[in-house]
Amino acid sequence: ITGCIGLTSSQCLEEFTDVHSLPHHDYGKGGRGWRDLWQDCLALLIMEPEQVRQMLIDNFGGVRFDGTNATIIGSKQGEFIADRNNITRVWMDHGAWPYLTTELYMQQTGDVEFLVEENSYFKDPQVCRGEEKDMIWNDEQGNKQLAENNEVYAGTVLEHMLIQHLTAFYDVGEHNHIRLRGADWNDGLDMAAKRGESVAFTALYGGNLKNLAKDIKAYAEKTGNETVLLAKELLILLNVDKTVFDRIDEKKQVLDAYCETVKHTISGEKVNVRCDELCSILDSMGDWIGEHIRTTEWTTDKDGDGWFNGYYDNSGNAVEGDFPTGIRMMLTGQVFTVMADVATDEQVVAIAKSADKYLYDEAIGGYRLNTDFKEVKTDLGRLFGFAFGHKENGAVFSHMATMYANSLYHRGYAKEGYKVINSLFKHCDNYSKSGIYPGIPEYVSQRGRGMYHYLTGAASWMLLTVLNEMYGVKGEYGALKLKPQLLKEQFENGKASATCMFNGKNITVTYKNDKALDAGQYSVKEIYIDGNKYGDCDTVLKEDVMKLNDTVNIVAILD
C-alpha cells in the first residue's frame, strides 16, 4: 500500500497485473486468479475510477451459468481460461467478491444503471457447479455460453450476480450452510469437499443478498423502471416458497433442477421480473441466512466468552469451540458475520473480546488467522500440515486482519478497528521485527517476519478501510458522505485530513475537531467547500459534487 500511494495509477495497474509473477521461489508459477481480478479493482476505484466501469463489465464474462466461474485470467481484459491444470475445482467464496466491487463502484459513482449493462457467460465442460461434465460440449463451440439458437447469450450484470448468489443459497450441506467444496478464501481448507460447509462465507452471501436488494430499489427509484429482464431459467431459483429454506433436501432439488436446465445451452428467453418482488425475495433469503447463523452457530468457552463457529469439516462436525485439546477459533467466521450484519451488537462486542483473548499476538503484528488446533486435521484442509504460525495455519494473515478491521469500523467499533490496523502497521513499519521494507506482506510468520510482501488484496482493503471507514470519506450512490471514525489521538492540533479522487474530482477533506472528541462522540455538523459554507450536513449531494472544481478543499466541522 505504501508503494502504491507513491506511484502513478498506471504504474500501480502494471504492478497489480504482474503481482503474482514475482520471484518468490515457493509462491507458485504466477498468474492472476479470480479474487485478484475483483480486489485489484477496489483500489483502482479509489485511484483511477474511470478505467473501472468497462473492466467490471468484462470481468463478469468469467461467470458460468451455474454460478461458478473461470479460475484463470488470460492476458487480455475479459479473457478467461478453463480449469487450473485441467483439474475441476470450485471455490465457494468466488461468487461473493464481484458484488462487493460492484457495490463500491455504484456507491462511489451513483451509476446504478450499471446493473443492466450486459455481457456473455463463460462456458467449458464444467457444469452443475463442478460435479458433472458437459459431454456434448467441444472446443469448436467456444468459451461463451450459447442459447438454443446457437447464438452467444448475453445477460445483465444484475443477472450475473443473481445467478452467483442464488445458486450458492441453495448449494447447502447437512447443516444448511453453503458447501465448502474445493475451499473458500482460505485455499488451505481443501479437504472437506464432501461434507464441509463455510458458515463464514454463507454470512457474506447473506449480507450481499440484502444489499443487492437495496441496489435494485435504488435502480428502480432512479430510472422509474419497475421491472428488470432476467433469463427465464432464473424463475426456478426465484419462485420458491420460503418454507423450503429450512428444508435441505428440497433446496438441493431446486438447485439440481436449475443446473440440469442450464447444463448445455439455455433457452435464450427472458422474462420481466418486478423489482419490488425481487427485492422481497432477496431480503427474505438474506434474513433467513442471518437468523439461521445466529441461532445455530454461536459458541462459547467455559468463561462464557463467545464467537461464531465458521466451518464444518468433512466429518460433519463443527470446527470451532471449546475442545479437550483447547480452544479452536478462526478469524474468518468472525469477520464476515460482523461485516454482513449477521452478528448483533452484543455479539460484536463478544467477538472482539474473544479475538483479543485467543487470536491477538502483539509480537507478530496482531490477530492470527486461527488458534493452534494441535492436530493435522485431514478432514478439513492441508493448512494443518503447516507448522502453527506459518501460512494459513495461525499466521497473522494481512488480508483477513484488514477485513476484520473493516468489519469493526463498519459496525462503529472504531477503537477495536484501529487496534487491528495499528498493530499491523507498527509491526511492518519496524524493519528489525518484520525484516521487510514498510508495506503489507501476505502474512507475518511465527518469528515475526513479513512474508511475500506484494499482495493487492490486503492493500486494496487497507486503502478502503482507512479512507472509507477510518476517515469516513465514502460514496452514497454518487453523493459524498463524510462519516469519520478517527480516534482522538489521530488528530494533530485538532485536525486530520485525507486526499483522494472522488467522481473525477481531486478532493482534500479536512476534519476540525476543536473539542477533542473521540470517535463515537462526534459527527459532521457543517461542511465548507473552498471556504464557502455548503450546509449544516454531512453529505455533499451528487449533483453538487459534479459541479465542483477539479481540485477542491472541503472542511468538515465535528461536534
Q: What kind of region is each of these model predictions?
A:
Residues 1-559:
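Acidic, mature catalytic/reactive cores of soluble proteins
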